[in-house]
């Protein structure tokens, strides 16, 4: 974000240097000194992140939101690809439940945002969403991408597989709330069902990530003088 805004980094990242030197190909300190998105992407050369970001750069589409979406795509596709390789059958199934639900919910939200706020074309929507479906069918994705209004999109969501998970009732407080409720539920259920497996660690990390997101949101609201309800 500092690079995108051409701002100098004020954070001292030296405390993370040893960890990144051991576990990563990235030079975190050098990256923190970059003053543009282009510099950041070039600084990632040799890492797994470079190729998808370099493609955006070549297309002239290397904006901060586009880069964030590309990283989300890489994350989910990588997890989905390696889960069967490194995990037992039971653990892979558990991970599929958690990440599959998370991907479905994100695709619902991204499609709604694309239709409601940006009026993106069908092709642009396909490029935006995660190309993996769990309980959502390709036909449902296509119907939402081709929908003429938001009511049609919401209709598909409410009548999807997640209907049996009461998504319509949860959507009374917004799709974002429904997505969080359903995803939280899956992570909680898998950890309780398999208390001596990787499901517990997976659930722990998920809820820690949620806590961090809430802390960041709170800090940003304080920083920009926003109220708690904003």
Model-inferred region functions:
Residues 1-230:
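Extended alpha-helical surfaces
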């Amino acid at each position: 974000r500092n690079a995108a805004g051409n701002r100098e980094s004020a954070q001292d990242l030296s405390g993370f240097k040893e960890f990144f030197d051991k576990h990563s190909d990235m030079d975190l300190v050098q990256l923190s000194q970059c003053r543009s998105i282009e510099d950041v992407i070039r600084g990632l050369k040799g890492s797994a992140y470079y190729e998808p970001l370099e493609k955006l750069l070549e297309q002239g589409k290397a904006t901060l939101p586009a880069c964030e979406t590309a990283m989300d795509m890489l994350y989910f596709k990588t997890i989905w690809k390696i889960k069967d390789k490194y995990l037992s059958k039971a653990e892979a199934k558990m991970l599929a439940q958690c990440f599959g639900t998370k991907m479905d919910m994100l695709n619902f939200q991204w499609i709604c945002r694309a239709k409601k706020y940006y009026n993106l074309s069908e092709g642009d929507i396909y490029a935006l969403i995660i190309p993996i479906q769990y309980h959502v069918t390709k036909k449902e994705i296509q119907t939402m991408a081709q929908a003429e209004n938001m009511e049609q999109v919401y209709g598909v969501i409410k009548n999807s597989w997640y209907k049996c998970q009461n998504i319509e009732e949860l959507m009374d407080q917004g799709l974002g709330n429904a997505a969080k409720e359903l995803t939280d539920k899956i992570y909680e259920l898998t950890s309780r069902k398999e208390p001596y497996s990787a499901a517990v660690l997976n659930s722990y990390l998920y809820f820690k990530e949620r806590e961090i997101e809430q802390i960041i949101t709170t800090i940003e609201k304080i920083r920009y003088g926003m109220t708690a309800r904003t």
